[in-house]
From Swiss-Prot:
Contains two intramolecular disulfide bonds. Keywords: Cell outer membrane, Disulfide bond, Membrane, Signal. GO terms for cellular component: cell outer membrane; transporter complex. Residues 1-24 form the signal peptide. Together with LptE, is involved in the assembly of lipopolysaccharide (LPS) at the surface of the outer membrane. It comes from the Bacteria. It is found in: Cell outer membrane. Disulfide bonds join C31-C724, C173-C725. The keyword Nucleotide-binding does not apply. GO terms for biological process: Gram-negative-bacterium-type cell outer membrane assembly; lipopolysaccharide transport. The keyword Membrane applies. It comes from Shigella flexneri serotype 5b (strain 8401). This is LPS-assembly protein LptD.
Length: 784
C-alpha cells in the first residue's frame, strides 16, 4: 500500500485534470425521474365542501341511497381520485350528523391517488366524508418522493396524513429494484412527522432477512425524529473489529441527543458515546460523554493503574443573554494521556499535545467589558505532567474614543496561576495597561500613533525547589514597569490595469511601523503563560513577540512591508502578494536565559515574512507563505498549496508544510516540542484528490510523506458507490499514532471502514467526497 497509494493518486490527479464533463445528470434528478409527480392542479380548501365528479360507461341506482357505476369508472373530489372497473356508491343518513355518510366500494383494477400517495389493488373502499381509504392486496407509491411497497391491506387515515399497512413492506428503491426493504406486521407512515413506524420489523437485503426488531422507526424526510440511525462498521489494528449503532433522540424542539453503542472487539467491551445538543436563552451548546467501562488492552499495557475505565467529556457553549452577558465554555478532558491514540474522536486527535478546560462569563456594554474565566490544561505526556492553570482570571477593558483627536483604552488583568505539581512556582499577577491613540486618515492612507504604559506586579510563592536548582533566582515580589511607543502608517494606491483584463484593478499598499519598548530584565519572573507567537506577514506588525504577559521583549525596530492586490470587475480578489521585514536597531531581549537566541546579540534585518494568494481561474488557486528568522537559523516556517477544484466532488490539491526544529522548540511547550517525532522539525509533502470515476462511483485519496524521516505520515483511500436507494462507502487509512521510545520507531494505525447509507429517506444524494475528505486525520482545507 505504501507505493500503491501515490501511484493511484497520480492517476486520479491526471484524470481529474483532463476528464471531460461527460457525467450523467445529478443523481437526485435521476432518482426523481422514477418517482411519480402530481400533475393535476392543486385544489385548496375543505374537501367536504368540494363537489364529487363521477364518470363511467354505465350507471344505475336507487336514489338517493345507492348507485352502481361500471366501465372505466373515474371519481374525483378535490385532489383525490378513485378509478376502478366497478364502483358502488352508498349514502346513508347518520343520526346526529348534518351530512349523510357517503361510502364507496371499488372492484377490479382499483387505482387511488392524491397529491401524497398512489394505491393500487383489486379491491378498495373509501369514505368520501372523512377521506379514509382502504385497498386490499395491492401496492403503493409515494408522490413526489421516494418510497413504495406492498401490503395485504393499505389504509389512508387522518385526511391522508397516515398510510397504514397490514403485513406490508417499505423501500425507498425505485420500481424494479428491491435491494433493501423493511417488512412488518403493521407499518404506519406519518407524513406530518415524516416517520415510518414498523412493528415486528424484518430488514431484508434482496429476499434475505438479516435483521429483526419488534419495533423500528425510519425517517422519511428531513424532519428531526427519534429512532435508530444506520449502523456502520470498521476494522483497525488498534481495536480490531468495531461496530456502531447510533440512536437519535429528539428530546424537545431545543434539544436532542445521539446515543451510540460502539463495540470494540480488542477492547472487549462497548463504549457508550453520548452527544447532547441544546439551545437555551444563554446560548447554544454541545456536550459529549464517552464511557468505556473496562479496557483489557489498557489493563495489559498499564498493570499499575487502579482502573481501566476510559472516558471523554467535551463541552462547548457560546451565547449571549440580555444583550450584555456572554457565556463561553471550551472544555475537553479524558481519562488518560493515551486516549486519543487509542480512539478516534472528532473532539481531539493523536496529534494534540494537551486538552483545554476553559470557562468564562463576560459582561459587555458600550465602552466597557469584563470577563471572569478559569483555564486549565491536561497535558498528554507521561514524562512531563507540569502545566499551569489560571484560577481565576479577570480581564477588564474600558474604551473612550473621540476624546478630542484621541482614542483611549484601559486594559486590566488579574490572574492567579496554579501548577499541577506541588513543587513548582505559583503566582498572582496584576497588570494595568492604559493606551492612548492618535488616529489620522484620509482616502489614500492612515497613520496611527500609539503610546502605552505597561505596569505588572507579581507575587510569587513556592519558590524553594526551583531556586535551589537554578542559578537565576526568582523573587517573591516583582514589579515591572515599561512604556511602549508605536507609529504605524499605511497607504493604498490604486490603478486600473486594462492591459490584463477589462475592469481589473491593482492596489499597492505599503506599510511601515516603528516600535519602541525598553528592556526590562525578567529573569526573576517565572514563565507562566508566554510562548513565541507564530508569525506570518500580518504577524510582523504585532507589538508583542510573545503571547501572554510574562515575557515582554524589548524593541527598537522598524517593520516595513508592502502588499499588492488585483481585483476583477466584480471586485473579487484574484491575486495578492505581501512581503515584509523587521529591522532591529538593538537586540530584542527579555533577560530569560532559557531563550537561546538572546545570547547571540543580533541586530539588523532578522525576520522576513511573505504571503501570497493567486486565484488563477474559477478552478485553479494557489496559496503560500514563508518566514525567515536568522535568530532561529534560516527558514522558520513555510507552507504552500495549489488546488484544482471543478466542484465539491472533483478536486486535486498538492501541499507542502515546513517548520524548523528550532521554531518548534521555541513555539511549543517543552514537553511537546521535544517529542521524538518533532526533533528534526516538520517537512511534509501531501496530495489530496477526489473525483467521480463513473456515473455513481466516487473515489478520494490523500497521501502525506515526511521528507525528514523519509516515512509516510498519513494516507487515506475511500471509495463510495451511490444509488437512488443506498450508498456504500469503503475506506482505508494508515496514520501516524505515536512513537515507540523503546524500539525507536513510529507507530502506525491501519483502519478499514465500511458504511452503508439508505438513500431516498432524506434529501441527501451526495457522492460522499466531502465527508471522506473531512474524516482524515489531516483534513482537507479549501485553497480557493
Amino acid at each position: 500500500m505504501k507505493k500503491r497509494i501515490p501511484t493511484l493518486l497520480a492517476t486520479m490527479i491526471a484524470t481529474a485534470l483532463y476528464s471531460q464533463q461527460g457525467l450523467a445528470a445529478d443523481l437526485a434528478s435521476q432518482c426523481m425521474l422514477g418517482v411519480p409527480s402530481y400533475d393535476r392542479p392543486l385544489v385548496q380548501g375543505d374537501t367536504n365542501d368540494l363537489p364529487v365528479t363521477i364518470n363511467a360507461d354505465h350507471a344505475k341506482g336507487d336514489y338517493p341511497d345507492d348507485a352502481v357505476f361500471t366501465g372505466s369508472v373515474d371519481i374525483m373530489q378535490g385532489n383525490s381520485r378513485l378509478q376502478a372497473d366497478e364502483v358502488q356508491l352508498h349514502q346513508k343518513e347518520a343520526p346526529g350528523q348534518p351530512e349523510p355518510v357517503r361510502t364507496v366500494d371499488a372492484l377490479g383494477n382499483v387505482h387511488y391517488d392524491d397529491n401524497q400517495v398512489i394505491l393500487k389493488g383489486p379491491k378498495g373502499w373509501a369514505n368520501l366524508n372523512t377521506k379514509d381509504t382502504n385497498v386490499w392486496e395491492g401496492d403503493y407509491q409515494m408522490v413526489g418522493r421516494q418510497g413504495r411497497g406492498k401490503a395485504d391491506l393499505m389504509k389512508q387515515r387522518g385526511e391522508n396524513r397516515y398510510t397504514i399497512l397490514d403485513n406490508g413492506s417499505f423501500t425507498s428503491c425505485l420500481p424494479g429494484s428491491d435491494t433493501w426493504s423493511v417488512v412488518g406486521s403493521e407499518i404506519i407512515h406519518d407524513r406530518e412527522e415524516q416517520v415510518a413506524e414498523i412493528w415486528n420489523a424484518r430488514f431484508k437485503v434482496g429476499p434475505v432477512p438479516i435483521f429483526y426488531s419488534p419495533y423500528l422507526q425510519l425517517p422519511v424526510g428531513d424532519k428531526r425524529r427519534s429512532g435508530f440511525l444506520i449502523p456502520n462498521a470498521k476494522y483497525t489494528t488498534t481495536n480490531y473489529f468495531e461496530f456502531y449503532l447510533p440512536y437519535y433522540w429528539n428530546i424537545a424542539p431545543n434539544m436532542d441527543a445521539t446515543i451510540t453503542p460502539h463495540y470494540m472487539h480488542r477492547r472487549g467491551n462497548i463504549m457508550w458515546e453520548n452527544e447532547f445538543r441544546y439551545l437555551s436563552q444563554a446560548g447554544a451548546g454541545l456536550m459529549e460523554l464517552d464511557y468505556l467501562p473496562s479496557d483489557k488492552v489498557y489493563e495489559d499495557e498499564h498493570p499499575n493503574d487502579d482502573s481501566s475505565r476510559r472516558w471523554l467529556f467535551y463541552w462547548n457553549h457560546s451565547g449571549v443573554m440580555d444583550q450584555v452577558w456572554r457565556f463561553n465554555v471550551d472544555y475537553t478532558k479524558v481519562s488518560d494521556p493515551s486516549y486519543f491514540n487509542d480512539f478516534d474522536n472528532k473532539y481531539g486527535s493523536s496529534t494534540d499535545g494537551y486538552a483545554t478546560q476553559k470557562f468564562s462569563v463576560g459582561y459587555a456594554v458600550q465602552n466597557f467589558n469584563a470577563t471572569v474565566s478559569t483555564k486549565q490544561f491536561q497535558v498528554f505526556s507521561e514524562q512531563n505532567t507540569s502545566s499551569y492553570s489560571a484560577e481565576p482570571q479577570l480581564d477588564v477593558n474600558y474604551y473612550q474614543n473621540d476624546v478630542g483627536p484621541f482614542d483611549t483604552r484601559i486594559y486590566g488583568q488579574a490572574v492567579h496561576f496554579v501548577n499541577t505539581r506541588d513543587d513548582m512556582p505559583e503566582a498572582t499577577r496584576v497588570h494595568l495597561e492604559p493606551t492612548i491613540n492618535l488616529p489620522l486618515s484620509n482616502n489614500w492612507g492612515s497613520i496611527n500613533t500609539e503610546a502605552k504604559f505597561l505596569a505588572t506586579h507579581y507575587q510569587q510563592t513556592n519558590l524553594d525547589w526551583y531556586n535551589s536548582r537554578n542559578t537565576t533566582k526568582l523573587d517573591e515580589s516583582v514589579n515591572r514597569v515599561m512604556p511602549q511607543f508605536k507609529v504605524d502608517g499605511k497607504m493604498v494606491f490604486e490603478r486600473d490595469i486594462e492591459m490584463l483584463a477589462p475592469g481589473y484593478t491593482q492596489t499597492l499598499e505599503p506599510r511601515a511601523q516603528y516600535l519602541y519598548v525598553p528592556y526590562r530584565d525578567q529573569s526573576d519572573i517565572y514563565n507562566y503563560d508566554s510562548s513565541l507567537l507564530q508569525s506570518d506577514y500580518s504577524g510582523l506588525f504585532r507589538d508583542r513577540t510573545y503571547g501572554g504577559l510574562d515575557r515582554i521583549a524589548s524593541a527598537n525596530q522598524v517593520t516595513t512591508g508592502v502588499t499588492s492586490r488585483i481585483y476583477d470587475d466584480a471586485a473579487v480578489e484574484r491575486f495578492n502578494i505581501s512581503v515584509g521585514q523587521i529591522y532591529y536597531f538593538t537586540e530584542s531581549r527579555t533577560g530569560d536565559d532559557n531563550i537561546t537566541w538572546e545570547n547571540d546579540d543580533k541586530t539588523g534585518s532578522l525576520v522576513w515574512a511573505g504571503d501570497t494568494y493567486w486565484r488563477i481561474s474559477e478552478r485553479w488557486g494557489l496559496r503560500g507563505g514563508i518566514q525567515y528568522d536568522t535568530r532561529l537559523d534560516n527558514v522558520a516556517t513555510s507552507n504552500s498549496s495549489i488546488e484544482y477544484r471543478r466542484d465539491e466532488d472533483r478536486l486535486v490539491q498538492l501541499n507542502y508544510h515546513y517548520a524548523s526544529p528550532e521554531y518548534i522548540q521555541a513555539t511549543l511547550p517543552k514537553y511537546y516540542s521535544t517529542a521524538e517525532q518533532y526533533k528534526n522539525g516538520i517537512s511534509q509533502v501531501g496530495a489530496v484528490a477526489s473525483r467521480p470515476i463513473a456515473d455513481r462511483w466516487s473515489i478520494v485519496g490523500a497521501y502525506y510523506y515526511d521528507t525528514n524521516a523519509n516515512k509516510q505520515a498519513d494516507s487515506m483511500l475511500g471509495v463510495q458507490y451511490s444509488s437512488c436507494c443506498y450508498a456504500i462507502r469503503v475506506g482505508y487509512e494508515r496514520k501516524l499514532n505515536g512513537w515507540d521510545n523503546d524500539k525507536q520507531h513510529a507507530v502506525y494505525d491501519n483502519a478499514i471502514g465500511f458504511n452503508i447509507e439508505l438513500r431516498g429517506l432524506s434529501s441527501n444524494y451526495g457522492l460522499g467526497t466531502q465527508e471522506m475528505l473531512r474524516s482524515n486525520i489531516l483534513p482537507y482545507q479549501n485553497t480557493l
